[in-house]
Design a protein with these regions (language model features):
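C-terminal charged capping/lid subdomain of soluble metabolic enzymes
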Residues: 1-16, 185, 301-424
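A glycine/threonine-rich phosphate-anchoring loop and its flanking beta-alpha core
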Residues: 23, 122-220
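Short beta-strand/turn micro-motifs composed of small residues
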Residues: 53-54, 108, 165
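Non-transmembrane, aqueous-exposed alpha-helical and coiled segments at domain scale
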Residues: 84-98, 134, 260-274
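A short, small-residue-rich loop immediately preceding and capping a beta-strand
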Residues: 99-119, 123-133
């Protein structure tokens, strides 16, 4: 399957002309053979000092199929155990890569891609994506999810110039990784609802075409969950296609707004380990659990609006002491304060928000029910409850209360700080 990126780079009904940096996207068996051809005699032959960034697991998974490619590259194999996209990993790459690299090949999943695109951006060299698992939607984005100074941040980076997703590689990835990819897509229900609500309440820029792209990705996966979990190659290709569509949506907008909001803010909080210890869970697993928690909270808000028990109130910073207690103990308080300046809610009047409540309810009503979402996640083998990722119920309320502060992006979870819900 060849995806024509030019289809997404055109004037849009939102008033913008979306820019797409990726030149070629190939999702099929034998895709890495095409990559080798391009490096030998095609459009990539001009690069004479390529660097492969992979880890011990992804190298083992690709060594045989990519032997000819590895022979022509500097290959940097990072230890997969405990690997994170952070300053430590960046330093390892910088200390070991040759000075004259002119191309980076990211051979791996989300963490390897974040490290690679961050390095590519800093050193102003292009990079190529070789996904080894359909585990997330970050392969073609222009941002990197990095842990910097203890805080999970989305930082400007670069998109790959080409993607070579070889079905012979990613369809054989552990089922846990594939389930994480499904989880990442199922969570789009939440972030799309948040984007619609932010547009309704504040007039924030909104692109319907990009939303349609994310919804297409969701539909593609929902209809094939059973076959994907059974490792059917054609359906695994559809999952990879859906994940790349989601990444293209982010590339079109220039940030992660179409694919990340309240549900990812919850996972960022967990990643910071200020209310919990280290979690032995994949990113997608944490995202699906967070999405389910947020869905339950949003349905609670919608029910209160329907029953006339929810009304807008003026914004007051009621969390200052909790922020000091939670983030201060790890020296992150000033970073969190800086992230949240100026306060998003100070621009919203309670009178205007009150008028928006029915519209908010309608947007929430479009979301799947808790039962439907639980069934979808269960069918795909995804994590569903806090217990699945090593947390317990005591983490739920602080997670929902503190998560909005991890990223200055408007969500209903943040807006709920201006809602007075009675009768519970």
């Amino acid at each position: 399957m060849r995806v024509d990126a030019d289809d997404f780079a055109r004037p849009c009904s939102c008033g913008r002309e979306h820019q797409i940096a990726v030149k070629e996207i190939l999702i099929e068996a034998g895709a890495v053979e095409k990559l080798e051809e391009e490096m030998s005699e095609g459009m990539l032959r001009e690069y004479i000092s390529p660097l492969v960034i992979c880890d011990t697991n992804t190298y083992a998974a690709t060594e045989e199929l990519m032997e000819d490619i590895y022979d022509r590259c500097q290959v940097l194999i990072l230890d997969a155990e405990g690997l994170q996209a952070d300053r430590h990993a960046i330093k390892i790459v910088e200390n070991n890569m040759e000075e004259d690299i002119d191309l980076i090949l990211a051979v791996g999943a989300g963490t390897i891609h974040d490290i690679s695109r961050y390095i590519a951006h800093n050193y102003k060299v292009p990079f190529i994506s070789v996904p080894t698992a359909a585990s997330g939607d970050g392969f073609v984005t222009t941002v990197a999810a990095m842990t910097l100074d203890g805080v999970k941040k989305t930082v400007p980076s670069v998109a790959p110039i080409c993607v070579y997703a070889d079905t012979d590689i990613f369809s054989k990835a552990p089922q846990r990784l594939t389930a994480a990819g499904i989880s990442d897509l199922m969570a789009k229900y939440i972030c799309l609802a948040d984007w619609k609500i932010a547009n309704l309440v504040t007039g924030e820029y909104f692109c319907r075409e990009t939303v349609k792209l994310e919804e297409k990705a969701l539909k593609t996966v929902k209809s094939s969950i059973q076959d994907i979990t059974e490792g059917e190659e054609d359906e695994c290709e559809q999952l990879m296609y859906a994940l790349i569509l989601s990444g293209l949506a982010m590339q079109m907008i220039g940030n992660s707004r179409p694919a990340s909001c309240a549900e990812h803010q919850v996972t960022h909080l967990w990643d910071m380990e200020v209310i919990n210890g280290p979690l032995d869970a994949l990113h997608g697993e944490k995202v699906s659990v967070a999405a389910f928690l947020v869905l339950e909270e949003y349905k609670r808000i919608a029910a209160a609006i329907t029953q006339g028990r929810c009304h807008a109130k003026p914004y007051e910073n009621e969390d200052e002491e909790l922020l000091k207690e939670t983030f201060g103990k790890k020296g992150l308080l000033e970073e969190i304060r800086k992230e949240n300046e100026p306060e998003l809610l100070e621009t919203i009047s309670p009178q205007h928000l009150e008028k928006c409540l029915n519209g908010i309810e309608e947007i929430i009503d479009e979301l799947p029910s808790e039962q439907t979402m639980f069934h979808l996640l269960e069918k795909a083998g995804c994590a569903k409850t806090v217990y699945d990722i090593g947390l317990d119920e005591s983490a739920v309320l602080p997670s929902l209360r503190l998560a909005p502060y991890t990223r200055r992006r408007l969500s209903l979870l943040r807006i709920s700080k201006m809602l007075d819900i009675r009768g519970e």
